[in-house]
Amino acid sequence: MAHRKRQSTASSMLDHRARPGPIPHDQEPESEDTELPLESYVPTGLELGTLRPESPTPEEQECHNHSPDGDSSSDYVNNTSEEEDYDEGLPEEEEGVTYYIRYCPEDDSYLEGMDCNGEEYIAHGAHPVDTDECQEAVEDWTDSVGPHTHSHGAENSQEYPDGHLPIPEDDPTVLEVHDQEEDGHYCSSKESYQDYYPPETNGNTGGASPYRMRRGDGDLEEQEEDIDQIVAEIKMSLSMTSITSASEASPEHMPELDPGDSTEACPPSDTGHGPGRQEARPKSLNLPPEVKHPGDLQRGLKTKTRTPEERPKWPQEQVCNGLEQPRKQQRSDLNGPTDNNNIPETKKVASFPSFVAVPGPCEAEDLIDGIIFAANYLGSTQLLSERNPSKNIRMMQAQEAVSRVKRMQKAAKIKKKANSEGDAQTLTEVDLFISTQRIKVLNADTQETMMDHALRTISYIADIGNIVVLMARRRMPRSASQDCIETTPGAQEGKKQYKMICHVFESEDAQLIAQSIGQAFSVAYQEFLRANGINPEDLSQKEYSDIINTQEMYNDDLIHFSNSENCKELQLEKHKGEILGVVVVESGWGSILPTVILANMMNGGPAARSGKLSIGDQIMSINGTSLVGLPLATCQGIIKGLKNQTQVKLNIVSCPPVTTVLIKRPDLKYQLGFSVQNGIICSLMRGGIAERGGVRVGHRIIEINGQSVVATAHEKIVQALSNSVGEIHMKTMPAAMFRLLTGQETPLYI
């Protein structure tokens, strides 16, 4: 590769600043659709299944190719020729892929749920749609929803292997966008960003990948129906009307799509190359229009930034169609109040994920049009990973990618020196183009596209010193893929290995690059909301956070557990071979100390004979073994192991069998943050006012504001909770204990 002369020191310092610069695309990609099954989720975190990903297809360039083995983690530089497939050994039809990206919101979006008889729990989400007419004019999103409030399986998610490298001594900024995974919680990270994509407003059309996924008209129609229905539900939530009433609403209140809007949303883009790199770039990231070289004027791509009013709107017919089939909710979500025509509309709020503006170094308008950073491309490699790697493992993977690329560079340099006695040039100067639609890597000299990734395919960004690691999902077909390698036959989804492509760059502005990509996700989501007539400020949770911060945690539990009079150490006598004679149940997720509760005692058994224990007591430890945080089955096993002992030492906290809950809700617009089914609390939003008030998953509601609800219908319980303002007093107990005490279950003593 020709070695380009570096700029002067002053120019070089300016050269690394970002500048707006729309990057053209060689051709329009065909849209790709996949079936999107509806799963359920509590809308406290943002998780989106993305559509129509584009395979990162680097164009030809003068560099050394290191083709990876299909089933290994071989290093390679991401430069391929027409004769080589990007992933050696994969058939051409595998180039189409559905990627699933999960947004990990801030701490208030952790979800813990329990399966209540398997009924669906439906919430609202945003879904992508593609149209043949506009090709890539509208990029919206879909949430996968399913029978668990916290489960989001993505068949075709791709993740990467657990590395064993030390965490870097530097304190790198990490921007993380997770895949959808079937795990029990959402990842919380203040450096995570929402993965939503607005319509193509900057003229940046799809990448130039020659590989396309075949799509049937039936799939498109099904997908559009789901998307339209969900977008309609979002709008309904924001207008505070129920699904039933909204389905009967007058059509004139629905947005319409003029034929002109569709044309405006997807202006044809000319094939060409982006502007060349300038010798000096502005110092500020609030950038004026750049001056192009004469040779670049012919290659420039004209873009237009549209106002929210000009962006595509959803057709009236599609919105109405989505409302004609209201879903039967077996669980009632109390993240927002249920519908009540007697309540003023202004008092209701959407149960839709909050919008959190992510600060960054760029102006939103610049990110929509696209900005460019100067960098040196060091190389690429691929890794394998499980579906659900932790944040630490992600960081190790980034370190592993850097190590591999550096080893590869060193080997290439030695080889070049051996072949040609001169000094070898192993760095490639590139322009890193970042927008709300995609990330492109352009050769700085020729402006040829080396890599092109849709923003939604980016799963992880890390800056380590002056190194930037960009991780993107690999292609994966709908059927079983060679990209998915099971370590053992019949391995679970979480144990499968998935491929990921890692690009490594070097730049003085590594931190700015990482921050800008993270900011791009936030701006993309904001644009998506506006394009669908939703004001992001309506989803802001700032006031809600302020209310939460004024409330005490766990009601009076802290005082009760810290009172030494309630903490007792007991010594029980029993005969050898005799069971303790107790039934224990879980205290419920959300309790200050997750342990087991004494739910029943056998008449004449050692526990009952002692007279020292009461139903409702929480057992902290047995014979010095702590039970706090252990699964119920483990605790039961420890108790069963006492059979051959004659003395048992227990540490307990005396508690009444009924838990008192106090929820402070100043206004109906503040969500309660839990869901109920048949009087049982099924899920709970971490950090919400319900958790702070003492609500626990798995508890049955016995009383609300002094009124017994034991024999009350589910709908009336939900209505009572949804319409309650001020202090909401509840009494609850573990559902299993309630069934034992009411004779619905026969106790199995241990």
UniProtKB/Swiss-Prot annotation:
- Per the UniProt entry, what are the Gene Ontology biological process annotations, in alphabetical order? chemical synaptic transmission; in utero embryonic development; locomotory behavior; multicellular organism growth; presynaptic modulation of chemical synaptic transmission; protein transport; regulation of gene expression
Residue ranges of the PID domain? 367-556
* SUPFAM superfamilies the UniProt entry points to: PDZ domain-like, PH domain-like
Question: What residue spans carry the Acidic residues bias annotation?
Answer: 81-94, 219-228
Give the start-end ranges of region Disordered: 1-94, 143-346
One Pfam entry name: PDZ
Q: Which GO terms describe its molecular function?
A: amyloid-beta binding; identical protein binding
Q: Where is the composition biased (Polar residues)?
A: 70-80, 238-248, 332-344
Q: Which residue ranges does the record annotate as region STXBP1-binding?
A: 185-271
Tissue expression profile of the protein: Specifically expressed in neurons, predominantly of the cerebellum, hippocampus, and spinal cord. Lesser extent in neurons of the cerebral cortex and anterior thalmic nuclei.
Q: What does this protein do?
A: Putative function in synaptic vesicle exocytosis by binding to STXBP1, an essential component of the synaptic vesicle exocytotic machinery. May modulate processing of the amyloid-beta precursor protein (APP) and hence formation of APP-beta.
Relay the domain remarks: Composed of an N-terminal domain that binds STXBP1, a middle phosphotyrosine-binding domain (PID/PTB) that mediates binding with the cytoplasmic domain of the amyloid-beta precursor protein, and two C-terminal PDZ domains thought to attach proteins to the plasma membrane.
State the protein's name: Amyloid-beta A4 precursor protein-binding family A member 2
Organism encoding this protein: Mus musculus (Mouse)
